[in-house]
Amino acid sequence: MTTPFHMAIVIPARDEQELLSRCLRSVQNARLMLPSHVTSDLIVVADQSTDDTYQVAWDFVQGNGTVVESQAGCVGAARALGVRRALERYRGPRNRCWLANTDADCHVPATWLQDQLAFANTGYSATAGIVDVDSFAEHEPFVSDRFRLAYLIHADGTHPHVHGANLGVRADAYLQAGGWQNLYTAEDHDLWRRLQRGRHKHISVASLCVLTSGRKAGRAPLGFAGTLAAYNGAA
């Protein structure tokens, strides 16, 4: 009998006390949508936070996951730490553990884990989804249109984007590819390239979509917030 998949959700969080609760509630809703035979775990990495991020996370996850403290100040290192803790907590086979990655300023849909599970069950080793922006209030009025025009999605529903905020990978493939590296930015593209080079079966689909914050100032240098901010300015 095939061992059911275990879903481990990993979320790095740095000074995210304002948005973290929204993220955790959405993740919990997604966990509740999983089939009863599928186990899940939630690991939040409070990375070099100076606000109440750790406490917000701890108050939420008690009994439903764990919170890890990190002083790395590096998103790649924080993600890697979260995965290590996830794999310490799951004793089953690595090829039956799915690592679902998102960010603390995101809101995932109720079917987010279900949808990744469906790809895992059909033999995929990794999934790359897209992001949409929750609000452009911090930006000039035309930024929304500029972003949506530039954010390419192919007619068949595939896309060229890679976001750590919406990346799933089977644990054995993750380990074979070398895992998250200690990168301050573009750690997601780096891992995805190594998964591709390793010939792991992967898919990039727009049907996997999470909402992310539209803030101008993000946590990672040259991250998504910087991409959005660059759309401001003279037309």
What are these regions (language model features)?
Residues 43-55, 106:
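A conserved acidic beta->alpha catalytic loop
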